[in-house]
Amino acid sequence: MDSNDNNDELLSRSEIDVLKVYFGDPIHVDEKIVIHQPTIGEIVEFGEIKFWYLANRLCANPTSMRLELWDAGVDWTEISDFDLFISIIATLDKEESSFIFGDLELQMFRPVVVKDEEGNEKPILVYLPDPTIQIDEELYKKIVGYLRVMFNIHPKVEKAKGKITKEWMINEERIALENEKKKRKDEKWMPSALFPLISSALNHPGFKYKKSELKDVHIFEFMDSIKRLQIYENTTALLKGMYSGMIDTKNIKEDQINWAKDIYNS
């Protein structure tokens, strides 16, 4: 089995304008395709479970969907990210597509095989209402690269050689899924990833937003705030320990006491 947690990025981090993502600006991946980043309030109105399902679908790679692919008779090691994306967007409805892409209906794209400059065949997506709108593999990488950063969804990549190894991996994932379903039966309400984070943030003295204001905060900014608060608390605890003599400063690295550090490229 070959596993790599860091090779999921489809484009370099240097190509991501993280400041635009942070401020929730529309992301123009080309002249006609624009990504809209939802706010917390929009996610609440849309439905959190629906939102995460949509986000995980759009950010998926073959590894993250290998169980579904395997059950459909497809080996996840033999399908590309782009081919998977082509099959996924065909299943979206208008509401799901418009939540992220506005008037652009992803389900209206159709795959067409064209030849590149070297005569090699490659698939592209053509938008039926306006054939001048097209998505090739490079543009797909840009779209999904932004979405993965925006929603903090970075699926790992796992390859496997041999049918026995693949079947073992699938069986392990199936067991984990069944265990998760059993666990969910005992929960008092629908699972929410955002609820404990929102509750914690609103009750933290360092969080600057009121509940009514939080609805206008974009998802990336909110999740960044959660990470930054955790780093701030850890940094403060370390500094107090250092000043009190309870912690040996020789074992503390400089970035451990810098709560304003870059938390994405470190």
Model features per residue range: what roles?
Residues 84-187, 191-194:
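Hydrophobic, aromatic-lined core segments that form the binding pocket/scaffold
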Residues 39, 80, 135, 218, ...:
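General structural signal for secondary-structure boundaries
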Residues 2-10, 114-123, 205, 249-252:
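Intrinsically disordered, low-complexity coil segments
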Residues 1-79, 148-241:
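An amphipathic, hydrophobic-aromatic interaction surface with interspersed Lys/Arg
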Residues 17, 25, 29-33, 40-42, ...:
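Generic structural motif recognizing short loop/turn segments at the entrances and edges of beta-strands
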Residues 243-266:
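Long, intrinsically disordered, low-complexity Ser/Thr/Pro-rich regulatory/activation regions
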Residues 25, 37, 61, 110, ...:
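Intrinsic-disorder/low-complexity coil detector
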